[in-house]
UniProtKB/Swiss-Prot annotation:
Gene that produces this protein: silR
The name this protein goes by in its record: Probable transcriptional regulatory protein SilR
Organism from which the protein derives: Salmonella typhimurium
Single Gene Ontology MF annotation: phosphorelay response regulator activity
Domain of life, source organism: Bacteria
Entry GO terms, CC: cytosol; protein-DNA complex
Length: 228
């Protein structure tokens, strides 16, 4: 597995490179945004670890350009920017995970391995798929097991958010912030979140044996393929 690290702090970059190499990965390190973007566009990587506050091209712009170019490799944002606004922005731009500095290497390694083994979710420029649930981002058509599912615009956005973060526990507060940011139709009221998820679940899960949308009691929700 080949990983690209885009990190301008030399000590942090060397620390990450050494640790990931010892864990068995092939690692490239770019110490500026332009070089990192060029490498990500021209070479094949299984994962990109990307800082946001880079001296030339920032991480926000890099991930935006990568996704616009159809690059679908997992991206883990590693940054000192830790507010919920920053987290939501990163995830919405196309990041697959977000880790705030300072961090424990053991946690970063666990997140890296999780991202690399997500073989059940396929993400291309226009299609999202989990198990037998398919979402076409261009036509905005949703189907499960070949059956068409009609969603409202808000339900579609919520489903896309869940699929892009398949296997992650999403707190109600994060879902609320995301939906307000996109549609301005929810408050932080957890009941509103529960209602929105219940309506989505009724359409994508109720008529099927395998339930993809799971409740994590006391925390929030998660979209995943249950173990057989």
């Amino acid at each position: 597995m080949k990983i690209l690290i885009v990190e301008d702090d030399i000590k942090t970059g060397e620390y990450l490179s050494k640790g990931l190499t010892e864990a068995g990965f092939v690692v490239d390190h770019a110490d500026n945004g332009l070089t990192g973007y060029h490498l990500a566009m021209t070479a094949e990587y299984d994962l990109v670890i990307l800082d946001i506050m880079l001296p030339d091209v920032n991480g926000w712009d890099i991930i935006r350009m990568l996704r616009s170019a159809g690059k679908g490799m997992p991206v883990l944002l590693l940054t000192a920017l830790g507010t919920i606004e920053h987290r939501v922005k990163g995830l919405e731009l196309g990041a697959d995970d977000y880790l705030v500095k300072p961090f424990a290497f053991a946690e970063l390694l666990a997140r890296v391995r999780t991202l690399l083994r997500r073989g059940n979710t396929m993400i291309t420029e226009s299609q999202l798929k989990v198990a037998d649930l398919s979402v076409d981002l261009v036509s905005r058509k949703v189907s499960r097991a070949g059956n068409r599912i009609v969603l409202t615009s808000k339900e579609f956005s919520l489903l896309e958010f869940f699929i892009r973060h398949q296997g992650e526990v999403l707190p109600r507060s994060l879902i609320a912030f995301f939906m307000v940011w996109v549609h301005e139709f929810l408050t932080a009221d957890t009941n509103a979140i529960d209602v929105a998820v219940k309506r989505l679940r009724a359409k994508i899960d109720n008529d099927y044996g395998t339930k993809l949308n799971q409740t994590v009691r006391g925390v929030g929700y998660m979209l995943e393929i249950p173990d057989a």
